[in-house]
Amino acid sequence: MTKKNKNQTLALDLDNCEKLTQLKEIPKSRSSSITSIESEGSIQSVLKPPPMREFEDVVAFESYIRDETWDNDFDYCHAHLSYYPPFITKEVHGNMDKIKPTMNKKSRKFKRNLQHHIQKHLMPEMEKCSGFTMDFGKAGVEETPTMLKWKFEDTSDHGFSKEEENQFDRHWKLQLEVTCNNENPLVEVDYMAIPI
């Protein structure tokens, strides 16, 4: 995989995203994220949580996931996306002033469309961008009067053999949380890849 210059941006092409065919060594830059904790006379090394990047555009979010794979940091990243889902922008024809007060978590149609968008569009596009297999399975659902949250977790081997994961010590899990509220159609997506 080629690395892009900081000034140069590559357009996201979901049909031509490169697959991650084999694992590599953990980047040396990650050693700065390891902290030592002393407790009861012993010292334990702990990896700090990955720094969070904020996005307001799905394409920028997916490009970040692709770039983290290119940079060999696919197993240590945290991204937060706040956006209006495509089915909302399509319904209001791109004019956000036309958003109806019923376009939120209280509407069964909104919840159904959002769930369809997550499972049929967002997650498959994230998988294409990452270059490895994502298997989030069934979602855990938390609902309160003010918000609805889908929680997904993937602790699979991501399409790599256990031998290859052990050889490079690359074991990681993925967490994906998608939240909507009862006030507007804004959707919050929190994606985290954490080494285990």
UniProtKB/Swiss-Prot annotation:
Renumbered residue ranges of the record's region Disordered: 28-48
UniProt KW keywords: Cell membrane, Membrane
GO annotation, cellular component aspect: plasma membrane
Localisation: Cell membrane
Gene3D superfamilies per the UniProt record, alphabetical: Respiratory growth induced protein 1 (3.40.1000.40)
GO biological process, one term: energy reserve metabolic process
Top-level taxon in the UniProt lineage: Eukaryota
Low complexity bias locations: 29-45
Membrane topology of the entry: Peripheral membrane protein
Protein purpose: Involved in the control of energetic metabolism and significantly contribute to cell fitness, especially under respiratory growth conditions.
Family classification: Belongs to the RGI1 family.
The name this protein goes by in its record: Respiratory growth induced protein 1
Taxonomic lineage of the native organism: Eukaryota, Fungi, Dikarya, Ascomycota, Saccharomycotina
